[in-house]
From Swiss-Prot:
PANTHER family: NADH DEHYDROGENASE, NADH DEHYDROGENASE [UBIQUINONE] IRON-SULFUR PROTEIN 7, MITOCHONDRIAL. Belongs to the complex I 20 kDa subunit family. It comes from Acinetobacter baylyi (strain ATCC 33305 / BD413 / ADP1). This is NADH-quinone oxidoreductase subunit B. It is found in: Cell inner membrane. PROSITE patterns: COMPLEX1_20K. It holds the Pfam family Oxidored_q6. NDH-1 is composed of 14 different subunits. Subunits NuoB, C, D, E, F, and G constitute the peripheral sector of the complex.
Length: 225
């Protein structure tokens, strides 16, 4: 399986502050050396990742109208607590997940980047809505054309605005990614600077492409609920 290796770049003075490269499974080489110890490490990674993915604490942060849909997921109708993400934190130092919901203006970009840097590892980012993904309909000087220009993004949620169910699906996709990640199990001091291995996830558009092409008879508007 292919992974994306992310390492901090101490020489970078502007974003991106990390270096990325596509590598093979980091445990495969160790399996050939010592099956027992590598298997034990694999079990520890799975247990730790299970705890991480089921206790993702979002940072209470919104920049535009998509935040209304984000707040709707916290109601009893959608019950975000099913995924362990109902603990909304007011401080980035206590949060694991930043959901950028809405337009990222140029004046807001330094604030978003500073808040992201204040979050402790491990941390993840969900870009919610067309404006956060690519600037949306605001192709103007005052809007950043995608929040991934200033911080790394793990999951993109399309829509203007996306429905709460779309954000819940994004959270489920993020949980799948977290389960397959490979991070240091403790603090790492040295040249590696805590490398992070993230799996290369297939976009939902590509995953469902064959299924959608196979559809010949579309449902009428009366049948869609």
């Amino acid at each position: 399986m292919k992974y994306t290796l992310t390492r901090a770049n101490p020489d970078a003075n502007q974003y991106p502050l990390q270096e990325r490269q596509v590598v093979n499974d980091p445990l495969q080489e160790e399996v050939n050396k010592n099956v027992f110890m590598t298997r034990l490490e694999d079990v520890l990674h799975n247990v730790v990742n299970w705890g991480r993915k089921n206790s993702v604490w979002p940072f209470n942060f919104g920049t535009s109208c998509c935040y209304v849909e984000y707040a709707t997921t916290l109601t009893g109708v959608h019950d975000l607590s099913r995924f362990g993400a109902e603990v909304i934190r007011a401080s980035p130092r206590q949060a694991d997940l930043m959901i950028v919901a809405g337009t990222c203006f140029v004046k807001m970009a330094p604030v978003i980047q500073r808040l992201y840097e204040q979050m402790l590892e491990p941390k993840w980012v969900i870009s919610m809505g067309a404006c956060a993904n690519s600037g949306g309909m605001y192709d103007i000087y005052s809007v950043v054309q995608g929040v991934d220009k200033i911080i790394p993004v793990d999951v993109y949620v399309p829509g203007c605005p996306p429905r709460p169910e779309a954000l819940i699906q994004a959270l489920m996709l993020l949980q799948d990614q977290i389960q397959l990640e490979r991070r240091p199990l403790s603090a790492v001091i040295g040249d590696d600077l805590q490398p992070v291995y993230k799996p290369k996830m297939m976009p939902e558009r590509d995953r469902k492409n064959a299924e959608r092409i196979a559809v010949k008879n579309l449902r009428s508007m009366d049948e869609i609920k």
